[in-house]
From Swiss-Prot:
This is LYR motif-containing protein 1. PANTHER family: LYR MOTIF-CONTAINING PROTEIN 1. It comes from the Eukaryota. Pfam families: Complex1_LYR. Belongs to the complex I LYR family. GO terms for cellular component: mitochondrion. InterPro entries: Complex1_LYR_dom, Complex1_LYR_LYRM1, LYRM1. The lineage of its organism: Eukaryota, Metazoa, Chordata, Craniata, Vertebrata.
């Protein structure tokens, strides 16, 4: 993390914890609220810890944009979990063929900004 990006990253980190503290589940049930609050805190810790070694300013900007998008989507839909998306299937292409590489490229392009930190599960 560089000196220029540090305040923004720390602001986002604190903002997530403030949101988690005030979070109410859409169902109104206390056990779901507690579970969702724990998920928000655990997810933030996991992703910030995973990305703490990043020093490239462009990559840090991507991560902060992803964080902002996740916050906005979570608050708008009142759902702390990432929204499911449809990714193009890989089909029956051989793993080292041009078709497979083209399909991989399409899958990466189709992935929205708020899911860049998630690994591919197909």
């Amino acid at each position: 993390m560089t000196a220029g990006t540090r305040p923004e990253v720390l602001h986002l980190y604190r903002q997530i914890f403030r949101i988690a503290r005030k979070w109410q589940a859409a169902s109104g049930l206390m056990e779901e609220t507690i579970k969702e609050r724990e998920y928000i805190v655990d997810e933030a810790r996991k992703l910030f810890h995973r990305n703490k070694q990043i020093t490239d300013v462009a990559m840090i900007k991507e991560c902060t944009e992803e964080c902002k998008a996740r916050i906005e989507i979570g608050l708008h839909y009142r759902n702390p979990y990432p929204r499911p998306i449809h990714l193009p299937p890989l089909g029956l292409a051989l793993p080292h063929s041009k078709v497979f590489r083209a399909q991989e490229k399409l899958r990466k392009q189709a992935k929205p900004v708020y899911l860049k930190s998630y690994d591919e599960i197909s």
